[in-house]
């Protein structure tokens, strides 16, 4: 498969989910915080704080960017 296209599709789906489902973001943030627990005691708290602080900004930024640009930023698509 084409990693770039897959990324664009995933970001598009995420943006649609955020737009149409108010609890989606909350679930995503909670899931991310649960993943933090894998890092061990000291790092887990730091990870959770980071998510609490930046998740809203990150989601707002994601909502205002084109999926292709986001995928380019994270390295799944060639920058144009």
Swiss-Prot record:
Glycosylation site list: 21
UniProt superkingdom: Eukaryota
GO biological process: lysosomal transport; sphingolipid metabolic process
GO cellular component: extracellular region; late endosome; lysosome; membrane
Segment forming the signal sequence: none
Gene3D superfamilies: Saposin-like
Post-translational modification comment from the UniProt entry: The one residue extended Saposin-B-Val is only found in a minority of the chains.
Keywords, alphabetical: Disulfide bond, Glycoprotein, Lipid metabolism, Sphingolipid metabolism
Domain Saposin B-type intervals: 1-80
The keyword Plastid appears for this protein: no
Disulfide topology: 4-77, 7-71, 36-47
Function statement: Saposin-B stimulates the hydrolysis of galacto-cerebroside sulfate by arylsulfatase A (EC 3.1.6.8), GM1 gangliosides by beta-galactosidase (EC 3.2.1.23) and globotriaosylceramide by alpha-galactosidase A (EC 3.2.1.22). Saposin-B forms a solubilizing complex with the substrates of the sphingolipid hydrolases.
Self-association state and partner proteins as the record states: Saposin-B is a homodimer. Interacts with GRN; facilitates lysosomal delivery of progranulin from the extracellular space and the biosynthetic pathway.
Protein's recorded name: Saposin-B-Val
Protein source organism: Sus scrofa (Pig)
Lineage: Eukaryota, Metazoa, Chordata, Craniata, Vertebrata
């Amino acid at each position: 498969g084409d990693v770039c296209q897959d990324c664009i599709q995933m970001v598009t789906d995420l943006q649609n989910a955020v737009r149409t489902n108010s609890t989606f973001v909350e679930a995503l943030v909670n899931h991310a915080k649960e993943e933090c627990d894998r890092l061990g005691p000291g790092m887990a708290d730091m990870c959770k704080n980071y998510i609490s602080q930046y998740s809203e900004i990150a989601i707002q930024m994601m909502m205002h960017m084109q999926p292709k640009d986001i995928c380019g930023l994270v390295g799944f698509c060639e920058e144009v």
